[in-house]
Every structure is written in C-alpha cells, then in structure tokens.
Amino acid sequence: MRRLIEHSEKAAPRRLKSARRIHYRHGLGTAEAVSLHDGVSTRQVVKWLVTATLAAIVGLTACRQLPDIDPSYHEFAYVSNGKSDSVSVIDTLALRNVKTINVGKNPTGLAVNPARNEIYVANTESNNVSIISTEKNEVAATIGVHRAPYFVSVSSDGKRAYVANSGSWNVSVIDLDKRAVIATIPVGNAPGLAKVSPDDSVVAVSNRGGNTVSLIDTHKLAVRDTLPVCSQPQDLVILPDSSKVYVACPGNNQLASIDLKTDRVVALLDIGKLPIQMALKPDGGEIFVSNFDGNTFSVVEAYTNEVSSSYLIGRNPVRGLVTSDNSLLYVSNFGSDNVSVYAIDEGRVIGSVGVGSRPDGLALTPNEDHLLVVDTKSGDVAVIRTTKTRDNSKISAERALVTMIPVGNQPNDIVIKAFRSGGK
C-alpha cells in the first residue's frame, strides 16, 4: 500500500513549495490510470452506507426546483457502463434513471455533438462507435473503427468526430452527416486520446507508447508533425484560442506545452506525482492538474508556462471540472470517496462532499445548480446540490448530497445534453 499524505480537509491546504520529480513506477494506459487501488476499509464502507441511506431518503422526494419548463425542453445525462455494455440515461430535471441503452462492448469515452441531438460512445472492446439519438434515447447507428478506441472528440460545427485507436496506432475520422469513416490516419505508438482544437484546424494525438504527440491537419486529413514530448503522454487540453496544447505525462511527472503556430515544444514543466487528468478554466488562463499518486493538484499558468502552486487535496484525485464563471474547481478523489471544492480566486479548498465508492467522471447541469459524480465501484451517480454566494468578494459554497442514482456496472464517463424536441 502506498504511503498516503495525511491531512485535514477542513483546514486550509498546505501550499507546496515545489513539485518533486519522481520516477513513474507503473506501466499504465489511458483507461487503466484510475484503477490502481482496490478495496476499501470497513470504516469507509460504513460511512458510505450511512451516506447512501440518508441520500436515498432524501431522494424519495428529490427533484430540481425549477420554474415552469417548456415541455419541449429536455435535459439528460448519459453514463457509460463499462462492464454492462450499456449507457444509462438520467433525466436531470427529475433526477432519476429513465432508460438503459445497450451499446457495444466495454463503452468508455462519451462525447456530445454541439450542433445536433446526438451522443457518441467509444466501445473499446467491440472496436466501434455508437451514435445515440438524444430525442429517442436509442442507438441510431453503429460505426466500425479500428482497435481499442477509448475517446471521441467532436468538431465545434458538429460535422466530424475523431477517434484514436489505441490498438492499431491510427485515428479514424467520421463524417457525422454520412455516418461513415472518411479517413484513417496513421499516428504514433498506442494513441490514447485525439482532441480537436476549438477552431477545428488541428487534432492533437497523445501517443502513449511512443512518447510523442502527433498533430493532424484537419483540412488535409494528414499528420503535419510528430513531436517528442515527455514519458507516456496521456491527457490533452487545448487553449480556447487554439494557440497551445498541453499534454500530461505520468511517465515522468511532467507537462509539455506545444505552440500550435510553430509546432514546437516550448516548455517541459515538472509537476506532481502521476499527473493523469487536466481541467482548463473556460477563460484559458489556468490549468488544474490532478496528481493521482501525490494526492495533490497543481495550478499551471497557461499563457506563461509556469507552475504557480500545488495543493494537498483528497486521496488520488482524478477528474477536475471548472464552473463557467471561472470561480470554482470541483475535483473527484478516487481514493477518499469524496469531491473537493476549490475557490480559484481565493486559492483555497473550501470544502468536500462525500459520495459513493471510487468517484471519477464529473458533469454540471446546464444552469450549474447540480453536480453529477460517477462512482465507478458502487455503480451509481451522486447528485450534489451546488449554490454560490458572494460576500465581500469571498466565495462561500453550500453543498448537499441530494440523492444517489443507480446506474450500470463499472460506470466511468458522463456527459449532459440539453435540447428542445425537434431542434438543437
């Protein structure tokens, strides 16, 4: 068992003076990065059972308090269930599971189309992508790709999807109007993630096995450059102005910054221990890096390529999610079964909320009044009520676990789609 950092979540976190560089000890892939720790203590189990029981009682009458809603308006959360070969559909207005959709084998990553009422599901073991109609909540099409797809990235105009095929070292390009693969582009060794830039001009691909990042020209549908970066590159974030891509490398605890105008690596930053996921502020100013083995998250100044600070948080932080007003960061702590809340402008952790077992994926409802948390081991989605008030420029947050919604076996990713019937 790893030595864990003991801390009190009620106290202000210690700011770490620097992030030590520690050699990576595990041969992890993208999908395996959050499955390192198994088993929980009796105390954790009892605590969770009590929390779940109370939440279930509240959940009997749980429903979001909203003004009168146009009956054509719908809001659904979609959860991929890896071991159930299905996607659960949660009505986020009623806060209940309304349907289970059978998809391919071992569904992992999900993506929302911003321009049409569709969700895309990467089925890792059946080597295909399911297209779900959100109006009918059923599979509208299944498109074969190549071996071991984990993630789907959709262009901002909703016309293309890009899928990195980890087992065949290439990227499939799907025309979403034709619902067909229009190109298969060779990239580096074991590509884990392909992400399209906000301006739709380039797709960045992290090649875990080759320690490189490939850059695909979306007009020519060809690789324009492949750059050596750091060890076992994994997660990617691209700045809102499409000027830079950052890549997290858990193999040597570094972040690489790539200038997309010159296609050059402009910085290698030492970060915390086992950086596996990044969360970007909507304004692009800061990146928050979850350091799984360090029990910390690091703050990176995106435009100056500097690590400004690191904070102790819960055990084994995984996903991060920033509110649209850039004020709060939510972090799921895989090892301590809770979600931490960090006030960005104040630079402090302001609280935590207990959830189910092994929390991972996060999603905020469109008006951000509820946070949904995927609990991978307990097979449910925790719903946290979120409110914010400002008093003398200080942010306080009142959070409460509203309910726990059962889903499938080993859920992992979650996305939310809001739309009106017959329209966008």
Where are these regions (language model features)?
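A cross-kingdom feature strongest in bacterial/archaeal respiratory oxidoreductases
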Residues: A11
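Short, low-complexity intrinsically disordered segments enriched in A/P/G/S/L with frequent Arg
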Residues: R2, R15-I22, A31-L36, S41
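Predominantly soluble domains enriched in secretory-pathway, periplasmic, or organellar proteins
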Residues: V58-K424
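Intrinsic-disorder-associated, low-complexity terminal segments enriched in Asp/Asn/His/Tyr and depleted
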Residues: H7, H23-Y24
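Residue-identity detector for glycine
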Residues: G27-G29, G39, G59
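N-terminal acidic, proline/glycine-rich, low-complexity intrinsically disordered segments
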Residues: M1-H7
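Bacterial N-terminal signal peptides
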Residues: W48-G59
